[in-house]
C-alpha cells in the first residue's frame, strides 16, 4: 500500500475507528465517521464527472467540513486546492481558473460572492455549499450534508503516491501560485516530525499501526479547530 493520504487515513480509521478524529466547537467526529463521510464525498465528486487529478477548490473556514472535503478529494486521487476566505472576486476567479478547478466547496456566507463569479468559471462542474446558517442554498449548488446523507460510500482501492498535493501561496507578491508536492515525498517528511516527537516511525505503510497505537496512547489522534 502506497504513501497516499487517503490510503494512510483509511488505515488509521480501520485501526482506531472509535477514536475522535476531529473536534470543532461542540462538533466531534470519530475516525470511522470521518472516513465514511469522505467516502461519500468521493462518490458525489465522481458522479459529477471528477476523477484522478481533478482539482477541487475548498473555500471554507477551518472546520470539520474542510478536512472531510479534502479527504474526499484524496479518495478520488484528486487535488484539493486551498482557497483563502479573504480573497475577493478577482482573486477567486484567477485562482480557480488557474488551478483548473472542476468543483468548489464553499461556506454558505460566501454564496453571494460565488454567485457573482460562477458564470466566469465554465470548468466548474459542481458547487457544494456548507450551510452555516447565513444564506439560503445558492441556485445551482448542492447542499453538503443533504448530498452526503443520500450518497453511497466509494469502494476503496490502492492509490498511487505519485498523486499531487498542491498548496497555493498567499499571493503577497502577485497572484497566488500553486506549489506541487507528490504524496510520496510529502508524507515521509511529516513522519520525520513524528520521529522528532519520539514516535516510532514505520518504514512501510503496512506498519502504520505502530505509530497509530503510540498516538492513541499520547492522545495525539485528534485535530481540534
Question: Model segments located where?
Answer:
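Conserved pre-ATP/AMP-binding loop-to-beta segment of ANL
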Residues: 18, 150-170, 174-175, 213-222
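Structural core segment of the AMP-binding/adenylate-forming
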Residues: 47-48, 75-146, 158
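Conserved AMP-binding/adenylate-forming core of the ANL superfamily
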Residues: 18-63, 70-71, 88-93
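Hydrophobic alpha-helical segments in the ANL/AMP-binding
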Residues: 9-11, 46, 64-83, 92-93, ...
